[in-house]
């Protein structure tokens, strides 16, 4: 008999006791009960905390922070510790840089958004470095290579990712559909198996100059190392369960992800991803405390999503100004200071 428990402890005890006895569950009720508990109390119940945690978009104005930076504080080669996360200002294609970032550790999941090699233009047709008609005044490194140079660049990055990750790693690799062949060549060259394409369906279109139809999606390659078995959190085990799912649960299994874009004027990068986008990937392909690798940090969306879901993000960014943006974003959200590693 357990006595002298406060309300949270009593609720956690009831859930844990029933779970130990393998009781039948009304999962909707369980989730509602879990939502009333603090994070540390959820852990003692034996239930997966991912059941109830949903990522929240932060209010950070990445574009304003980027524009306000006159001279970056970060320098090439700098490494920062952001709580459990690591951030390096370095080159993802250079093996030595990635080795320093990983610090002897291996990642279990990859979620990364490399330059698409499309020489991004603003809606007005100007280079993305222009501030007119939607440009940021910055530039995207490695976004205008020849096909051969781009294949070589992607291949180097993918070899590095393979070297510094576990054998059961899953990779999510965003790309531009017009360069599908380049990405597939690089996957093949670096011995990655490409399993399927995931589609991010946006709530608004992108004006696509020179194309018959405007684009409203971005594709992502899902894969793993050839001849290896990748990890996946398999919550649905049989067809009967699928037919009993609510739509909100069922859609988590689909290869089309509908997530709203960030407001375009807030973009610090043209392919910037909302924090909710990595959520289902992180829950499907990693566990709490796993290391998630992102070698193209951008504005820090992967790192911030990992932070909310108790994963550790090891991320690389070549542009020192973006490194400063990521640090400011983390510090604003957590109230903690980044430290030089």
PLM feature spans:
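SF2 helicase/translocase NTPase motor core
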Residues: 339-341
């Amino acid at each position: 008999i357990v006595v002298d428990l406060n309300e949270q402890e009593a609720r956690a005890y009831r859930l844990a006791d029933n779970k130990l006895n393998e009781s039948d569950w009304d999962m909707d009720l369980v989730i509602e009960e879990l939502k009333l508990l603090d994070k540390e109390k959820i852990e003692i119940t034996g239930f997966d905390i991912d059941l109830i945690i949903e990522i929240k978009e932060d209010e950070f104005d990445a574009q304003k922070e980027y524009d306000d930076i006159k001279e970056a504080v970060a320098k090439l080669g700098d490494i920062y510790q952001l709580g459990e996360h690591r951030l390096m200002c370095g080159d993802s294609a250079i093996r030595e840089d990635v080795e320093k970032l990983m610090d002897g550790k291996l990642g279990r999941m990859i979620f990364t958004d490399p330059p698409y090699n499309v020489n991004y233009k603003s809606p007005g047709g100007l280079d993305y470095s222009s501030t007119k008609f939607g440009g940021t005044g910055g530039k995207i490194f490695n976004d205008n290579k020849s096909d051969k140079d781009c294949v070589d660049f992607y291949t180097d990055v993918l070899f590095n990712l393979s070297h510094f990750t576990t054998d059961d790693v899953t990779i999510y690799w965003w790309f531009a559909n017009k360069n599908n062949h380049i990405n597939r060549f690089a996957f093949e060259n670096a011995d990655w198996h490409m399993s399927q394409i995931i589609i991010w369906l946006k709530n608004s279109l992108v004006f696509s100059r020179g194309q018959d139809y405007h684009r409203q999606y971005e594709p992502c390659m899902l894969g793993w190392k050839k001849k290896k078995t990748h990890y996946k959190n398999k919550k649905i085990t049989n067809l009967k369960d699928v037919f009993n799912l609510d739509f909100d649960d069922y859609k988590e299994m689909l290869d089309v992800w509908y997530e709203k874009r960030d407001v375009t004027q807030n973009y610090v990068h043209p392919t910037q991803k909302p924090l909710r986008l990595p959520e289902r990937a992180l829950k499907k392909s990693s566990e709490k405390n796993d290391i998630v690798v992102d070698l193209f940090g951008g504005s820090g969306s992967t790192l911030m999503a990992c932070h909310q879901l108790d994963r550790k993000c090891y991320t690389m960014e070549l542009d020192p100004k973006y490194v400063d943006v990521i640090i400011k974003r983390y510090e604003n959200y957590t109230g903690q200071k980044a430290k030089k590693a």
